[in-house]
Amino acid sequence: MAAITAASNSKQIAPLPKTLLQAAVMAIELDKPICLDYYVASYNKDCKIARDGTEGDKFLYKNPEEYTSPLKGMFKVDPGPDSQDSSYDLIFETQNSIYLASGNML
């Protein structure tokens, strides 16, 4: 088994454990895959929630080639009362997938 080694100076960007647990429960109940491809972009504020026209569907948007299908639901996940961290994550449900994003994007 290969090990993943990170430089001690680099900061690991990953969803909160509570977010991963909630997403896993949703994925099992809804029979949808969990997608993390917007997490780092959302952490770096390189993606946003966009709308198709003034009354159209909302979706996650990185660029003209990378965007999700319309959003069916959005859920905020706080780190919990014992955490010193004020950051939070977001879970987005689309027709086919569950996307995790950092609250930094808002």
Show the residue positions of the predicted features:
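N-terminal non-globular leader segments, chiefly Sec-dependent signal peptides
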Residues: 1-89, 95, 103-106
